[in-house]
A protein has these predicted regions:
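Conserved phosphate-chemistry cores used by DNA topoisomerases
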Residues: 1-215
Length: 215
């Protein structure tokens, strides 16, 4: 879980019998191209391995994994997406069997909460927010809109309902396309590697498909 919010509303939202939280402060190391000595001495990575009960790279043993679902939970903004990308890069390069076995997920926290009388909805983006603002929620009075700047701005009830309760949350399972595994590796290298010209080329090739940009 991203940030100090894990110490507050996150702990209040979890099921202590089945869910554990590991707070990560800031952006973790980009492991792609990093020396093994740097990986082995990185505090955040060591904490992560210890919490999961597994090693990295050739020392990874899927049988030692302590949890069935490893869920990356970050803020619903650009910085949160960057942290999620860094974590997925780490898991892809150092714990690939965990992904292949279907254990890695992304949480889908909302960006907005809309309330109208007794009616309440959570939405993930501006397009959905605008749709509800236009049509209304069906409650009484005006619509109250709150934007969550981060997970820490949610109270335990919000966080549980939207992100942590298995009966109401939304998760995205992280997978590798079995028909094009090499293409996945190439894409990770282009986006997360040490050659900025490859990232620039990717942006140039795909900028036409961007409809909304949060910067």
């Amino acid at each position: 879980m991203e940030g100090d919010s894990a110490g507050g509303s996150g702990k209040g939202a979890r099921n202590r019998n089945t869910q554990a939280l590991l707070p990560l402060k800031g952006k973790i190391l980009n492991v792609l191209g990093a020396a093994s000595s740097k990986l082995n001495t990185n505090a955040e990575i060591n904490d992560l391995c210890e919490a999961l009960g597994v090693g990295m790279g050739t020392k990874f043993n899927l049988d030692d994994l302590r949890y069935d679902k490893i869920i990356i939970m970050t803020d619903a903004d650009v910085d949160g997406a960057h942290i999620a990308a860094l974590l997925m890069t780490f898991f892809y390069t150092q714990m690939r069997p965990m992904i292949d076995a279907g254990h890695l997920y992304l949480a889908c926290p909302p960006l907005y909460r809309l309330t109208q009388g007794a009616k309440r909805v959570y939405v993930a983006d501006d397009a959905e927010k605008d749709m509800w603002l236009e049509k209304g929620l069906g409650g009484k009075g005006k619509i109250d809109l709150q934007r969550f700047k981060g997970l820490g701005e949610m109270d335990a009830k919000d966080l549980k309902e939207t992100t942590m309760d298995p009966t109401t949350r939304k998760l995205i399972r992280v997978t590798v396309d079995e028909e094009m595994p090499g293409e996945t590796g190439d894409l990770v290298e282009r986006l997360m590697g040490k050659k900025p010209e490859l990232r620039y080329q990717y942006i140039q090739e795909n900028a036409q498909f961007v409809e909304e940009l949060d910067v």
